[in-house]
From Swiss-Prot:
Protein family: Belongs to the GHMP kinase family. IspE subfamily.
UniProt pathway: Isoprenoid biosynthesis; isopentenyl diphosphate biosynthesis via DXP pathway; isopentenyl diphosphate from 1-deoxy-D-xylulose 5-phosphate: step 3/6
Top enzyme category: transferase
Function according to Swiss-Prot or TrEMBL: Catalyzes the phosphorylation of the position 2 hydroxy group of 4-diphosphocytidyl-2C-methyl-D-erythritol.
Catalysis: reaction(s): 4-CDP-2-C-methyl-D-erythritol + ATP = 4-CDP-2-C-methyl-D-erythritol 2-phosphate + ADP + H(+)
Name listed for the protein in its UniProt record: 4-diphosphocytidyl-2-C-methyl-D-erythritol kinase
Keywords: ATP-binding, Isoprene biosynthesis, Kinase, Nucleotide-binding, Transferase
Name of the gene encoding the protein in the UniProt record: ispE
Stored InterPro entries: GHMP_kinase_C_dom, GHMP_kinase_C_sf, GHMP_kinase_N_dom, IspE, Ribosomal_Su5_D2-typ_SF, Ribsml_uS5_D2-typ_fold_subgr
Native organism: Burkholderia ambifaria (strain MC40-6)
HAMAP family xrefs: IspE (MF_00061)
GO molecular function: 4-(cytidine 5'-diphospho)-2-C-methyl-D-erythritol kinase activity; ATP binding
The protein's Enzyme Commission number: 2.7.1.148
GO BP: any one term: terpenoid biosynthetic process
Length: 293
């Protein structure tokens, strides 16, 4: 990342994985209670921010399928302007890398990186807690990315506790299919009564490499998604022939963990022709963590 008084360039918006995802209940308002562990990756979209003197917020790169006015990045910047009353403006460039509808948190991560970067570029000096209170207005995953550490999540995903995770390499395979999150959450076959676990339960298992990630918990959405989307089921089945694998979020991406980059790259090299795979290392904290206190 490069930093100047008028621009911040090469700001990573990292992907996340759900190492497990349990749905423990459903609220009267339709929201779901969940438990999960969020893992940051050193792979994601790259954003560039340049000050404008006219106060406007503008996305200067096209993102296919995402109108500028509804882009979470633009909404995040405008929310920050409205909250602080700053007269500053910004041009935002986005180099998209993460697929949409993949369970990797791409749009949410872009929004969080925008909040953190503009907190620095606009010299707002908002606390992390204040930024998280804004982030929750943008989406359930955005507060996690502002939180900036690997986390055990509860509630609707907004109750976060930092967890220390070992360094691992991941192969993430994304089928060429978009899985709408709302469709999966509303499916009558979705399990919504998984027994709650504790952080201690998870930490007791996370240092064991045997059978990881399926040595702890599951993704309650995986069975619903694989029953509806054959492409996802095919990836899960193929990866399981190599090593234990699990879907992240509501899909469609599926991941497997390895002890080294070499092992992950070797597995990627075996992917069938036309499959989209990425190798990424785990992160302990968000690259812009220092942009809020």
């Amino acid at each position: 990342m490069t930093d100047s008084t008028r621009s911040l360039r090469n700001c990573l918006a990292p992907a996340k994985l759900n190492l497990f995802l349990h749905i423990t209940g459903r609220r009267p308002n339709g929201y779901h209670d969940l438990q999960s562990v969020f893992q940051l990756l050193n792979w994601g979209d790259t954003l560039h921010f340049t000050l404008r003197d006219d106060g406007r917020v503008a996305r200067v790169t096209d993102v296919p399928g995402v109108p500028e006015e509804s882009d979470l990045v633009v909404r995040a910047a405008n929310l920050l302007k409205a909250h602080t009353g700053t007269a500053a403006g910004v041009d935002i460039e986005i180099d998209k890398c993460l697929p949409m509808g993949a369970g990797l948190g791409g749009g949410s991560s872009d929004a969080a990186t925008t909040l953190l970067a503009l907190n620095r570029l606009w010299q707002l000096d908002l606390s992390r807690t204040e930024l998280q209170s804004l982030a929750v207005k943008l989406g359930a995953d955005v507060p996690f990315f502002v939180f900036g550490k690997n986390a055990f999540a509860e509630g609707i995903g907004e109750e976060l506790a930092e967890v220390e995770l070992p360094t691992r390499w991941f192969l993430v395979v994304t089928p060429r299919v978009h899985v709408p999150t709302a469709e999966i959450f509303s499916d009558e076959l979705l399990t919504r009564n998984t027994k709650p676990v504790t952080i201690a339960d998870f930490l007791a298992q996370q240092n064991s490499d045997a059978g990881w990630p399926d040595s702890f918990g599951r993704n309650d959405m995986q069975q619903v998604v694989t029953s509806k989307y054959a492409e996802v089921a095919q990836v899960v089945k193929w990866l399981y022939n190599v090593t234990p694998a699990r879907m992240t979020g509501s899909g469609a991406s599926v991941f497997a963990a390895f002890q080294s980059k070499h092992e992950a790259e070797a597995a990627k090299a075996q992917l069938p022709t036309g499959w989209n795979g990425a190798v990424a290392e785990s992160l302990n904290e968000h690259p812009l963590f220092a942009f809020a206190s």
